Regions:
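Extracellular/periplasmic, surface-exposed regions of secreted and cell-surface proteins
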Residues: 1-208
C-alpha cells in the first residue's frame, strides 16, 4: 500500500482558489500467497486498486486574476491616437480581461484490476477498469467583437468523464531448449462524455 498528499499554490488563480489539495493512494493484495488459497491451476493472483487527484494550472498568461493593458502606437495599424498634428500619439487598450474566480482544473483517476497467471504460468490475464473525471476544465472562450481585440479570460467551464476496460491475454511456453513461443491479445474499450458545462454552450476551439 502507498499514499501521498500535497498542497499546491498557483498565482494563476484568484485569492479564494489559489491553493489545491491533491492526494493519491494504491492497494495491492497477492491472494495466491495466502494459506487459504487452494486453487492448484492458478499460479499467481493479485488484486489491486488505486485512486488519485491531480491538478492542472496550465493557463496562458499565468496572471489571469488581473486585467492587462497594452500600448497602441502607429497609424499604419490604426492603433494610435491623433492629437493636433501628431498622428502617432501613444495610447493604451485592454489586452486581456481578468477572472478572479478561476480555479484549479482537477482530475480524479480510479483504477481497479487483477493480474492472473495459470497453467504453470503458460497463460496470463490482466484486467483493468479505469475511470477518469476532469472537473473545472480550463478553457478560453471566444469574445464578442463588440469588446474589441482583447483576449478572453480563461474559465472553468465544466466536467468530462472517461471510463472503460483494458484486457490483456498472454501465452508463454518454452517449446525447446532455445525456443519460446509468446503471444498477446489486447482488448480496450473507452467511453468519453461531457457531463456538465457552465451554460450548455461552448464557443471557440478545443481544451487541454
Amino acid at each position: 500500500a502507498s499514499f501521498s498528499a500535497r498542497r499546491d499554490g498557483s498565482f494563476a488563480f484568484g485569492t479564494n482558489n489559489k491553493f489545491g489539495n491533491f492526494f493519491a493512494g494504491s492497494l495491492g493484495w497477492i491472494v495466491s500467497d495466502e494459506d487459504f488459497f487452494k486453487v492448484n491451476f492458478i499460479d499467481y493472483l493479485k488484486l489491486r486498486g488505486s485512486f488519485g487527484i491531480t491538478g492542472n494550472e496550465n493557463v496562458n498568461p499565468q496572471f489571469q486574476r488581473i486585467s492587462t493593458l497594452t500600448y497602441a502606437y502607429g497609424t499604419g495599424q490604426n492603433a494610435g491616437y491623433t492629437f493636433g498634428n501628431d498622428p502617432t500619439s501613444i495610447g493604451a487598450t485592454i489586452a486581456s480581461f481578468k477572472n478572479e474566480d478561476l480555479g484549479w482544473e482537477k482530475q480524479k483517476q480510479l483504477n481497479a484490476g487483477f493480474d492472473l497467471n495459470f497453467s504453470n504460468s503458460k497463460f496470463s490475464l490482466t484486467a483493468d477498469y479505469f475511470e477518469k473525471q476532469i472537473s473545472g476544465l480550463l478553457f478560453t472562450p471566444s469574445l464578442s467583437l463588440y469588446l474589441g481585440t482583447a483576449s478572453a479570460p480563461t474559465a472553468n467551464i465544466g466536467t468530462t468523464k472517461t471510463s472503460g476496460f483494458d484486457l490483456n491475454l498472454g501465452y508463454n511456453n518454452a517449446t525447446g531448449k532455445n525456443w519460446k513461443v509468446s503471444s498477446n491479445l489486447t482488448f480496450t474499450t473507452a467511453k468519453n462524455e461531457v457531463t456538465e458545462t457552465n451554460n450548455g454552450l461552448i464557443t471557440g476551439g478545443g481544451y487541454g
